[in-house]
Each structure stands twice: as structure tokens, then as C-alpha cells.
Amino acid sequence: MLAAADRVKALREAFPSEGLFAEKEWLISPQPFAIEEKRRADLERLGHQLFVFQRACNQLYQQSAKGKQPAWVARYLDLGKPAELIEFSRGKEFREDLPRVIRPDLVLTDDGWTIAEIDSVPGGIGLTAWLNQAYAALGAEVIGGAHGMLDGFAKILPRGGDIVISEESATYRPEMEWLVRQLQNRFPDREWRVAAAENYQPQNGRDVYRFFELFDLPNLPGIDALLAAAGRGELAITPPIKPYLEEKMWFALFWLQPLREFWRRELGDKYFRRLQGMIPYTWILDPTPLPQHAVIPRLEIHDWREAAKFSQKERDVLLKVSGFSPFGWGSRGVSLGADLPQAEWEKQIDDALAKFESEPTIMQQFHKGKLFDQPYWDAKRDELKTMRGRVRLSPYYFVEENRAELRGALATICPADKKLLHGMRDAILAPSAFAERAES
């Protein structure tokens, strides 16, 4: 086996000359992130559990819109969205359509993991595919193998197709262009392209992988033709044009007592209890007054404005813009209450309540990640070091015939002092592998 320095050198030499992310850097580890072998079955099953959850979300919204479930469910999920987009998303042509790529962001904990969120339009597909290829070439048995990500993506666009990406998402364009080159080499009988969303011209029978956010539609002047073609059944779009499925508030709806029996029935008791152990308790910051005798569950407050007075210890929660906003994706609209000065915390609560009708916000229990050790190469000192950090694990599941198959898992290892886990210059990005691992 190659020494660590030689492995890092080989990984650097394998890096695409065109890059993978625009103006983004990360630390390189000589080995994959090791996930305990005893977690294998749980991680492989998680994809189907989340597929069933998203299917239930789709059903709940549609039944709510038709009056067969409480009307307030659809009202919550439609907040801030234009009427024409709501109408389009309810079209009978797309009734059963669900995302074909499921990527949860998991924070690894002492007990396994908690699901921070499910990414609606996940980036990192090309990056994870490259990492899997590069580390597999060095002999690592990465999750999904060398070509799992490519094969999974090809399954969701079986006729080939276009990855349609917006300027707003341009950071990810290099990885998508790399992905298309690899797909073209591996599946030469199909045509693959990356195309700009701003002036995209749809073609009959040419399916689309959507890599643009739905809040960005007003900035995409040519997108009406794509939506019209999808409405006529001339092509398929994934993820589907369903803004209600892209709201983080689904985790709050999952915990609401009036919907408990719906979730138990649609998920099945086993999946329901399993998801209860992984989905953090979440609230919607709704300023609607409560009856005098009522309190907000678990917080024991009568009015959200009381939350503005929480102590620093009580503020160990996350505030997140729920969706359909430039602040609704990535880490842009996320803050940890315990890290905010009291005045800033109060302002964020007040702003969230004031913007409820146009840009709803959720509050979510914060789970601090477990510490792991991962080697990385310090380029400045030209030596191997060990980072003790917290891990965001992002498994990629590709939906194939109503089954979600695990095809790769990107590990983002952040320094121990970082509480919000996301890609950053001083984080390690590595593929994952199942292995026996000593406790850290």
C-alpha cells in the first residue's frame, strides 16, 4: 500500500484540471472516512425510509389541498409562493412524481446520527463520484465503488438528458461538467449535456435534471418553455417542480400531534418510530395567537415572542429559513441561537415572525456531533496531521423502481470548534467506507 504522502500526491494528480467547484478548496485525507461496519444496514435502509417519508409528504400535501387532510398543512407549505407555481405543482400529470436523488445531511452522534435536513437540490454528485473514483483507484473499498454514483445518476435519466443549471448555482457547474464527461464515456449510446437555465431550450423526449432553485424562476426567462413541455408530457424533470416538497418545515409537521396517526399509517409503525429517533424536534415560528390555556409543545411558552427572552442555555437551537428563499439552501439562512448575542437573537425571532407569511422560519433542536479523528495533509508544512472534528455525512441514494439505492457517501469533517457543519476551506472532504473503527 502506498504511504500517506504518496496517496495524497496521487489524489492531487488525479484532480480534474477544470476543477470541481468554482473557487472552493478543502483539505485532502489519504484515506476514506470510516463508518463502523455495524452501521452498514442502517445506512443502506435509510434511503428507503426517506423515500417512503417523501412519498407520505407528497400525499399529505395533496390531500390537504383537496380538503381530505387539515387545510392548514397546504397553507403552511404554500406560504410565500406565487399562485401560478402552486397551481403548476398540483398538476395531475406530476401527482406521483418524487425526487429521484435523496441526500440527507446526517450529523454523526454517539447514538448514530440525526438528520439535519434533506437537501432538495443536492450538489456534490460530481464531487462524490470523483472522490469515489480517485480513492478506489488507490485500493479503497468506498461506499458505492468506483462507478456507483455514475451508474445511479444514469438510472434516473435512462434516456440521457440535460443537467440544467442556473447562474445562481454556478459554483457547482464544474462538477456537473465533469460528471457529464464521465457519463458520456461510460454510456456513449446516450447524450449528456450541461445547459444554462437562463436560456434553456427544451427538446421533446430529452429529460432534465434540475439544478436550479424554484425561488430563482423569475430570473430564468426561458424556463416557461421547459415547464410547458413538462406539462404536455414531452419530457420529465427531476427533482420535480414541487416547491412544497422542498420545505424544511416537514420536520415540524412530522412531530405535530394532529398528524401523528397519518404519519404512523403511511410510514408504518416501524419506519415511524425509526424516524422519530433521527428527525430532530422542530417548530414552525407561526405568530398566530394561541388560546389562553395552550402552550407551544416542549418549550412551554404561550407566545413565540417569549422565546426572544430565552437564556443562552435555552437558545441551544437552530433557526432556519424553511425554503423558497435565497436563504433557504446551504448554510446561508441557518444560525445557532446559543452563539448569538441576546440582541441579535431577539432580532432574528422578531424578523422571523414578521416575515412568516412570505418566508417562514423553523426552530430545530441542535445536536452536537461526535468527535472523530481523521488524517489530512497539511500542504503548508508538507506533513500528515490528524484533525479531531465533527462529521456531516451526506449519503446519496438514487431512486430506482421505488427503491432507494445507496451509491456513495460524502463525509465533511469540520474542526471541533465548528458547530455548523458544512464545506469550508479548513474542512476535510472525503468519500466514506465501511470498516471496523476504534471509538474516538
Q: What kind of region is each of these model predictions?
A:
Residues 1-440:
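Preference for protein termini
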